[in-house]
Structures are given as C-alpha cells and as structure tokens.
A protein has these predicted regions:
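UBL (ubiquitin/ubiquitin-like) substrate-recognition surfaces
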Residues: 1-173
Length: 173
C-alpha cells in the first residue's frame, strides 16, 4: 500500500496527484517514457509517477519538493492553507500540458455549437475541456444530457448581420 504524507493542509495536493497518476495516458507516458525536459515540476511529477507505479516500493511518499515547485508556479497555493483539489488538478494539468504538449489532445476535446435559423445554419467548433450548464440536478449524467439539448435564441443575428426572430442552438461534444 502506498500513500502520500500530509504535512498540514496538503491533502488537496496529495489528492490531485493521486487522481492524475491514475489517468491511463499520464501513467503510460511517465512510467514508460519519463520526462527529461526543462520543467522541474514535470520532472518531479514524472519521478513520482514512476515510483508510485513501482510494485516493489511500499512507501509513504514525501512530495514536499514537488509541492514547492507547484507553489513556485502558482503562488496562490500558500503552503499550510486549505485549497481546492479541483483547482489544483487543473493547474497541474496546465503545467503538464505545457511540458508535454501531446497531452493536450487527451485532456481537451472539441465543442461544436450548431445554430439553425430560418434559411440558414452555422456551426462553430472550438477546443474545450468540458462545459456543463448550470443545473439544480445532482446527477452529472443529467447535467451533461441537458447541455446537449436545443435552446431557443430570440433575435439572433447571423454572420451577415441579418436578425432572425428565432433560432435554435445546441452544443455537441
């Protein structure tokens, strides 16, 4: 069994690391290839990932050096204070994808917004992580399904500047 030493309100960081090393592409990339680039955080993360998945090691990890590198890049994560694990995960992903650009295609997909009005149709494609519309639901699946539903737009202006009384739009993932 393996764990990460909590040195006072570092559970957000420890949890973030544990989540990310279980992402198959991250595990595969850093265990099989490692990282030899200039980013000291990514070097430390790569080493941590390799050791984490080394079955011969049954240890508790001290990630203070890695945490220090993280705080150097994101000073708002003051050591000793409570922080949000989701925010830390996104910041770690930001570091990793800048160090290893091929990771971007695994963390981001495409969102296609489709808008239809009388006499026309337009699609707009953009890279995204995930978009969920605000909802009172507690079910992630329901929130995702609701994000795909058609919405009515009143007085929609198309790319040619023509205003249409009504149009419908939806996002496709």
């Amino acid at each position: 069994m393996k764990g990460i030493l909590n040195v006072g309100n570092t559970c957000y960081f420890n949890t973030s690391l544990q989540c990310l090393v279980h992402v198959p592409i991250i595990k595969s990339l850093f265990v099989e290839r490692g990282y030899n680039g200039p980013c000291s955080f990514t070097k430390g993360f790569s080493e941590f990932t390799r050791k984490y998945w080394d079955d011969s090691l049954k240890i508790t990890f001290n990630v203070n050096n890695l945490l220090g590198e993280f705080v150097n890049k994101f000073p708002r994560f003051v050591v000793g204070r409570q922080h949000d694990a989701q925010e830390a995960v996104l910041c770690i992903i930001d570091i990793l994808e800048n160090s290893v650009p091929e990771l971007k295609k695994h963390f981001y997909g495409k969102k296609i917004q489709e808008t239809i009005w009388p006499g026309g149709k337009k699609t707009h494609e953009e890279i995204f992580s995930i978009h969920i519309l605000t909802s009172t639901s507690t079910s992630l699946g329901e929130m995702m399904r609701n994000s795909l539903k058609w919405n009515v737009l009143n007085d929609y202006e198309d790319d040619d500047g023509k205003v249409h009384h009504v149009a419908t739009t939806r996002c496709l993932f």
